[in-house]
Amino acid sequence: MSQLEKIYGVHAVQALLQHHPKRVKQIWLSEGRSEPRLETLLALAAENRVPVGQAERREMDAWVEGVHQGVVAEVSPSQVWGELMLEELLERTETPPLILVLDGVTDPHNLGACLRTADAAGATAVIVPKDKSATLTPVVRKVACGAAEVIPLVAVTNLARTLEKLQQRGLWVVGTAGEAEQEIYQQDLTGPLVMIMGAEGKGMRRLTREHCDFLVKLPMAGSVSSLNVSVATGVCLFEAVRQRQVKR
């Protein structure tokens, strides 16, 4: 059991049952928990012969950090994608890729929110550097509401080199920066695209910025100078979605 991970929350556990049921070894519900929104989860567990047990809520509180909603699953360790897997994914992609890069985002809540947004926008994958970045944790999975089990999260050793390879494949690299001259709404986002979001406060690293084909900014009309990275990610990705739908 020590090799198993614990994930929690209704959406995260249900998404894992839908997409990777063989990874789920045991599901625990808090004692007396019974409500309509658990019906799908329990049906999936029964279909995949995953045992479901009950535990005291205080015991479950000790298992995980965060609001578990009375649902905890023991699962085999998750797999973070590597660069070769990304290349294979791009080979199979029939529509213009839309890749999100998070450069130095270390907060797990922000990573989870960005994964959720990227999945909702139909992004091909999310790329993060292996160092100085948040990675998949139970908190990330909970915040992502199931998206962490669907969208590929690719951890790369050398982000600059990865960007070069993507450019060689014909993808355009667009970075977000507050000092950029062009607003995102003026940039063509309909082609094969890499969208880079930097860490809050610091922004993109110098080497990452140097590999951008274009820099864009979000117009800020109020007194604040920037948005939370997950909010900015949503604005940028869905502008790309909007442009692509208009072009059809």
UniProtKB/Swiss-Prot annotation:
Keywords, comma-separated and alphabetical: Cytoplasm, Methyltransferase, rRNA processing, S-adenosyl-L-methionine, Transferase
Residues that coordinate or bind S-adenosyl-L-methionine: 198, 218, 227
InterPro entries linked: 23S_rRNA_MeTrfase_RlmB, Alpha/beta_knot_MTases, Ribosomal_eL30-like_sf, rRNA_MeTrfase_TrmH, SpoU_MeTrfase, SpoU_subst-bd, tRNA_m1G_MTases_N
GO MF annotation, one: RNA binding
UniProt cross-references to Gene3D superfamilies, sorted A to Z: 3.30.1330.30, 3.40.1280.10
Enzyme Commission identifier(s): 2.1.1.185
GO CC terms, sorted: cytosol
Database matches in CDD domains: SpoU-like_RlmB (cd18103)
Superkingdom as given in the UniProt entry: Bacteria
Broadest EC class assigned to this enzyme: transferase
Compartment(s): Cytoplasm
Reaction catalysis annotation: guanosine(2251) in 23S rRNA + S-adenosyl-L-methionine = 2'-O-methylguanosine(2251) in 23S rRNA + S-adenosyl-L-homocysteine + H(+)
TM stretches of this protein: none
Biological role: Specifically methylates the ribose of guanosine 2251 in 23S rRNA.
Similarity comment: family membership: Belongs to the class IV-like SAM-binding methyltransferase superfamily. RNA methyltransferase TrmH family. RlmB subfamily.
Protein name in the entry: 23S rRNA (guanosine-2'-O-)-methyltransferase RlmB
Source species: Pseudomonas putida (strain ATCC 47054 / DSM 6125 / CFBP 8728 / NCIMB 11950 / KT2440)
Gene: rlmB
